[in-house]
Amino acid sequence: MKKQIDKDYHLHIFHAKQCDPKKCTGKKMARFELARIFDKVQKIPRGSILLDPMAKQALSPADKHEQNITVLDCSWETVEEVFPHLMRLHLQHRALPYLVATNPVNFGRPFKLTSVEAFAAALYILGNKKQAEKILSKFNWGHVFLDMNKEPLEDYSKAKDSNEIIKIQSEYM
């Protein structure tokens, strides 16, 4: 029997240049060559999963087939203005389920994840826990995200589809 090898996903960031560069997790990921940053939406890979907090469908293990994951790195203050501009692109919009942020800016706030937390959550749900741990290891608070959200992440990673993710999420809210 063949041992299943986790595939690494290609991580992409559309950077809206709205955050404090010293606190920007997306820029730090790019410095460590863990993600690619784009400043033009046209450069986002076609068909990529876009982690979109306003998406109608939740990310689930059923999305494993896609190899590209993209986040929009912008201020939470402007997220509702920026995401609609991405609707016309050929991307698969997916929302992350209920998780609690552990970054220093939004610690303890549900859904207010940084780019690295969003990527780590997506990777975990899609079955690549090692890549999730690797990207979080560059942040001194990174391991806390997986520790604090371990139970829901495990449950989400066992769901079969978006509908099941929504049911599981309701147990944690």
Curated annotation (Swiss-Prot):
Record's keyword terms, sorted: Cytoplasm, Ribosome biogenesis, rRNA processing, S-adenosyl-L-methionine, Transferase
Pfam families listed in its UniProt record: Fer4_RLI (PF04068), Ribo_biogen_C (PF04034)
GO cellular component: cytoplasm
Residues noted as binding S-adenosyl-L-methionine in the record, renumbered to the chain: 25, 72, 96, 115
Coarse class of the protein's main subcellular location: cytoplasm
Catalytic class of the enzyme: transferase
InterPro entries listed in its UniProt record: RNaseL-inhib-like_metal-bd_dom, Tsr3-like, Tsr3_C
Catalytic activity: an N(1)-methylpseudouridine in rRNA + S-adenosyl-L-methionine = N(1)-methyl-N(3)-[(3S)-3-amino-3-carboxypropyl]pseudouridine in rRNA + S-methyl-5'-thioadenosine + H(+)
GO molecular function list: 18S rRNA aminocarboxypropyltransferase activity; S-adenosyl-L-methionine binding
EC number(s) per entry: 2.5.1.157
Protein's cellular compartments: Cytoplasm
HAMAP family hit by this protein: TSR3 (MF_01116)
Family to which this protein belongs: Belongs to the TDD superfamily. TSR3 family.
Function, as annotated: Aminocarboxypropyltransferase that catalyzes the aminocarboxypropyl transfer on pseudouridine corresponding to position 914 in M.jannaschii 16S rRNA. It constitutes the last step in biosynthesis of the hypermodified N1-methyl-N3-(3-amino-3-carboxypropyl) pseudouridine (m1acp3-Psi).
Protein name per Swiss-Prot or TrEMBL: 16S rRNA aminocarboxypropyltransferase
Species of provenance: Methanococcoides burtonii (strain DSM 6242 / NBRC 107633 / OCM 468 / ACE-M)
